Amino acid sequence: MEVAEPSSPTEEEEEEEEHSAEPRPRTRSNPEGAEDRAVGAQASVGSRSEGEGEAASADDGSLNTSGAGPKSWQVPPPAPEVQIRTPRVNCPEKVIICLDLSEEMSLPKLESFNGSKTNALNVSQKMIEMFVRTKHKIDKSHEFALVVVNDDTAWLSGLTSDPRELCSCLYDLETASCSTFNLEGLFSLIQQKTELPVTENVQTIPPPYVVRTILVYSRPPCQPQFSLTEPMKKMFQCPYFFFDVVYIHNGTEEKEEEMSWKDMFAFMGSLDTKGTSYKYEVALAGPALELHNCMAKLLAHPLQRPCQSHASYSLLEEEDEAIEVEATV
């Protein structure tokens, strides 16, 4: 009696398996290799299909940053760049612009277009007005709010789709000496004034709007007043909330025992658990043009822009390598 041998895969089946294992290359049309993410990465967000409008966090306890001195400040490791996919749609934005009014913003150190010295507050006011008016031309349903930050936070202009209403509050501002930075109070105020949208399926259903906070910040390195509460954790994990930062620093290297501006910049970046926000740093003694360039890069819709490490601002592909340092942070 003959014993049947176990069937072995044919050559055609082996070729099909080899082709299926080859990932698509990362190109301009597929900058993140989105269709080729590992099954395990997609499984981490599959449970969101019922829909609570939140993305999974890589490490729930990584953002507990309450502490006394710079020595005890532990910056969490960087979060994965992408944890969830959302529809790339140009839905309305609720943009909350948070402008720092510390005395560092009034120091005339930035080099203006004509070579004279100007301060970061004047440049920030102009670039914010240009940003708001340009976003309004792109989509008149976008809404904007202005929050000023010193020792406390104040909501100056409520959410409005009229750029003139925000700009009327933008220029009559004065700086002050600030002893602390109450980051927790800032996020609590944002939570009180806004409501994050919820969809039944975050991967297929576009949200009615997204909420984006843009913080223009300029202070010596100091540990902010911040402890991660459950409502804040949910806010940061929501796929429709974005926290962009433009950090204007002194550019000098502090002593080893002192906190550096790089520590502060790393801390701001660690708040983004989804890897979807943009962070820029600009030296206070540099050209004012750099600040305008950073704000221009924030014009892109947060649901339609790639991860910051994949962002490219050149017109020709051969220019990518030459400007890589300028295009990514």
Swiss-Prot record:
UniProt keyword Phosphoprotein, yes or no: yes
Gene, per the UniProt record: BABAM1
Stored SUPFAM superfamilies: vWA-like
Residues with PTM Phosphothreonine: T65
Keyword NADP: no
Organism the protein comes from: Homo sapiens (Human)
Classification via Gene3D superfamilies: von Willebrand factor, type A domain (3.40.50.410)
Described purpose of this protein according to its UniProt entry: Component of the BRCA1-A complex, a complex that specifically recognizes 'Lys-63'-linked ubiquitinated histones H2A and H2AX at DNA lesions sites, leading to target the BRCA1-BARD1 heterodimer to sites of DNA damage at double-strand breaks (DSBs). The BRCA1-A complex also possesses deubiquitinase activity that specifically removes 'Lys-63'-linked ubiquitin on histones H2A and H2AX. In the BRCA1-A complex, it is required for the complex integrity and its localization at DSBs.
Domain notes per entry: The VWFA-like region is similar to the VWFA domain. Its presence reveals similarities between the structure of the 19S proteasome and the BRCA1-A complexes.
Protein name: BRISC and BRCA1-A complex member 1
Biased composition (Acidic residues): 10-19
Region annotated Disordered, chain positions: 1-84
Domain of life: Eukaryota
Region (VWFA-like): 95-298
